[in-house]
């Protein structure tokens, strides 16, 4: 598998609207490279006699009635938020 570059990581972070530093981009490129290398090992497995599946469990069309309920009061909810910006909840970037 090709090594992920800092530029690719920064591009994906930008698409996800995450602000990351140069150091984080370098660290994430290395970490994501290790993850893709590990996942690449699956290509070495012989799956010729394995039936393709789309779901692990045989569950089909599990549905419930859609019932609308009143949500939280926005002002009360925002009182419990650790950090906010422009009226939105701000959470740490996780990559």
Swiss-Prot record:
Catalyzed reactions per annotation: L-glutamyl-tRNA(Gln) + L-glutamine + ATP + H2O = L-glutaminyl-tRNA(Gln) + L-glutamate + ADP + phosphate + H(+); L-aspartyl-tRNA(Asn) + L-glutamine + ATP + H2O = L-asparaginyl-tRNA(Asn) + L-glutamate + ADP + phosphate + 2 H(+)
Source organism superkingdom: Bacteria
EC number of this enzyme: 6.3.5.-
Pfam families named among the record's database cross-references: GatC
One GO term of the biological process aspect: translation
InterPro entries, sorted: Asp/Glu-ADT_sf_sub_c, GatC
Keyword field contains Protein biosynthesis: yes
GO MF annotation: an example: asparaginyl-tRNA synthase (glutamine-hydrolyzing) activity
Broad class of enzyme this protein falls into: ligase
Keywords, comma-separated and alphabetical: ATP-binding, Ligase, Nucleotide-binding, Protein biosynthesis
Protein family membership: Belongs to the GatC family.
Job description of the protein: Allows the formation of correctly charged Asn-tRNA(Asn) or Gln-tRNA(Gln) through the transamidation of misacylated Asp-tRNA(Asn) or Glu-tRNA(Gln) in organisms which lack either or both of asparaginyl-tRNA or glutaminyl-tRNA synthetases. The reaction takes place in the presence of glutamine and ATP through an activated phospho-Asp-tRNA(Asn) or phospho-Glu-tRNA(Gln).
Subunit record text: Heterotrimer of A, B and C subunits.
Name by which UniProt lists this protein: Aspartyl/glutamyl-tRNA(Asn/Gln) amidotransferase subunit C
Source organism of this protein record: Lysinibacillus sphaericus (strain C3-41)
Name of the gene encoding the protein in the UniProt record: gatC
């Amino acid at each position: 598998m090709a090594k992920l570059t800092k530029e690719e990581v920064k591009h994906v972070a930008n698409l996800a609207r995450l602000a990351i530093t140069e150091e984080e981009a370098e660290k994430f490129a290395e970490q994501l490279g290790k993850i893709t290398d590990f996942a690449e090992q699956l290509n070495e497995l012989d799956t010729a006699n394995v039936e393709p599946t789309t779901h692990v469990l045989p569950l089909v069309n599990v549905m419930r009635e859609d019932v609308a309920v009143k949500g939280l009061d926005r002002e009360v909810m925002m009182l419990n938020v650790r950090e906010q910006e422009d009226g939105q909840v701000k959470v740490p970037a996780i990559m």
